[in-house]
Each structure stands twice: as C-alpha cells, then as structure tokens.
C-alpha cells in the first residue's frame, strides 16, 4: 500500500480488526520510509443494479440519495439515524437478492414505502404522497382510508 504522506510503496500492517457487522476490515499501517502511521479500510465491493427512471434513463444506485429521501420523509419524526440505516440496509439486501442488472425506480420506491410504513406512519404518508404524485385530495384520502383500514386501532 502506498503511503499517503511520502508516496513510498512499502508499508507495514500494525493492526487489523474486523468491524462488528463483519463487512469491513480496519488496518493500521506504518510507512517504512517516513515512519508515519495511517488507517485503511477494506470493504466488500457490492454491485447494485442500475436504477431505471420513469423517463427511461439509467443511473447508478446511490445509498446517499436513498438516505436523503428517507430522511426528508422522516424529518422531525422520532426515528433514530441507526433505525434509518438499518432500513436502508434491508432495502439494499433486497435489491442485491433480486440478482438483476437493472431495476425500475418504482420498485425501489415500493421497497422504501414498506420500510417507512414499519418505521413511522407519518413518514410513510409523506413519502407516499410525493412518490405516488397525488393530483388531488381524493387520492390522498383514498390512501389514508386504505392505510387506516389495514392498521388496527389502539384502545
């Protein structure tokens, strides 16, 4: 591994540790030329399917974009960052399990809606209203009625 400080190509690994989830290795290294230390991370490279948008264009899957859209729906809601990350990981596992090279954005949207429904009902409704492009209040009301009839009432 090349030293980021002096560019020398010979470094020594001082310590290696596997992350808690088991998908990352953290290595502490020392440059044999300048004696400076640095950390590297080794991760499994996963190949997610390309996302086919409604207009037919294709974009690479981006975890950050998915996270941003979920955060927007969950804004000011009592859901932890950890819970959001876990939901995104479940979505990614489903995307990888499909084994497809391409997947329509609508399918990703449905996966997001399922996860949001489990996390927070208000966030689910927020996301669904934008995702399904409601044209008027009646469409919104239909979704709320569908949502209410499938959710048992407390009390």
Swiss-Prot record:
- Name the cofactor(s): Zn(2+)
Q: Does the keyword Transmembrane apply?
A: no
Q: How is the cofactor bound?
A: Binds 1 zinc ion.
Keywords attached to this Swiss-Prot or TrEMBL record, sorted alphabetically, are: ATP-binding, DNA-binding, Metal-binding, Nucleotide-binding, Repressor, Transcription, Transcription regulation, Zinc, Zinc-finger
**Presence of keyword Cell division:** no
Q: Name one GO molecular function term.
A: zinc ion binding
Q: Signal peptide: which range, if any?
A: none
State the superkingdom.
Answer: Bacteria
**ATP-cone domain: which residues?**
49-139
Which parts of this protein are zinc fingers (unnamed)? 3-34
Which residues lie in coiled coils?
none
Entry's Gene Ontology BP terms: negative regulation of DNA-templated transcription
Instruction: List the PROSITE patterns hit by this protein, alphabetically.
Output: ATP_CONE
The UniProt function text for this chain reads: Negatively regulates transcription of bacterial ribonucleotide reductase nrd genes and operons by binding to NrdR-boxes.
- Protein family per UniProt: Belongs to the NrdR family.
Recorded protein name is Transcriptional repressor NrdR
Q: Which organism is it from?
A: Cupriavidus metallidurans (strain ATCC 43123 / DSM 2839 / NBRC 102507 / CH34) (Ralstonia metallidurans)
């Amino acid at each position: 591994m090349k030293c980021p400080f002096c560019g020398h190509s010979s470094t020594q690994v001082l310590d290696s540790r596997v992350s808690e989830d088991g998908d990352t290795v953290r290595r502490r290294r020392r440059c044999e030329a300048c004696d400076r230390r640095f950390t590297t991370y080794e991760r499994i490279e996963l190949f997610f399917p390309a996302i086919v948008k409604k207009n037919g264009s294709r974009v690479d899957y981006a975890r950050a974009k998915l996270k941003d859209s979920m955060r927007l729906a969950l804004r000011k809601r009592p859901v932890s960052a950890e819970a959001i990350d876990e939901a995104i990981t479940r979505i990614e596992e489903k995307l990888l399990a499909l084994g497809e090279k391409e997947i329509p954005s609508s399918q990703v949207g449905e996966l997001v809606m399922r996860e949001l429904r489990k996390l927070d009902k208000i966030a689910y409704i927020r996301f669904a209203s934008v995702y399904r492009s409601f044209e008027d209040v009646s469409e919104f009301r239909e979704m709320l009625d569908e949502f209410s009839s499938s959710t048992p009432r407390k009390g």
